Amino acid sequence: MKAVNYYRERYKDTGIYENRLFDGIKELLSNLKKEGYITALATCKPEIYVPTILKYFDIEQYFDIAVGSELEGGARRHKDDVINEVFNQIIKLNKADNAHITNASDTTNVSDTADILNNIKADSIMIGDRKDDILGAKNCGIESIGVRYGFAEENELENAGADYIVENVQDIITTLDE
């Protein structure tokens, strides 16, 4: 437990700033927002640090939703857990956006929520640079774009079953436009 505590202390003070944005990411995020996409961050970094990281890189304004893992044995420890929480938050946004349409006493039934979730999944794509991103997407029933310019080892994205694999940020745009 001492090692875990040491790691967390170091990460909190230093580690969260040892990331970098890949070239073109800010522009990609800005364009996605301008085009009306709902953008979400699904990271296994501890959620408590996510706002700090987004602010540090000046990209918080590009995300509608940002979800991270939970510390101390929380329910969100794996990528698919994090992605599913993103879906839960999108459903809540969808219900809030449509609240004016229904009577305040009405409730959305389970089949409506399932339909909403299926529609969200059909319109979602996970972009990631590691097998956990790709496998998390598969476990959640959504497509994935594996990016080679990240941290994946050779053939990692292919072996994980990425639906698309791109070499650079521009290729992400091309893939999304297809």
Regions found by a protein language model. Give the residues of each.
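Short, structured helix-loop boundary elements
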Residues: M1-V4, F22, K26, E60, ...
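Short "lid" loop at the C-terminus of a central beta-strand within the Rossmann-like core
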Residues: P46-E47, S69
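Asp-based, Mg2+/Mn2+-dependent phosphohydrolase catalytic module
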Residues: S30, L54-E178
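Short beta->alpha linker loops
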Residues: R20-G24, K45, D129, Y149-A152
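Small-residue helix-packing motif on alpha-helices
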Residues: M1-A3, V50, S124
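Short, basic/glycine-rich phosphate-binding loops at helix/coil junctions
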Residues: A3-K12, Q61-A66
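Short, acidic loop-to-helix structural element flanking the phosphoryl-transfer center
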Residues: E9, D13-L41, E47-P51
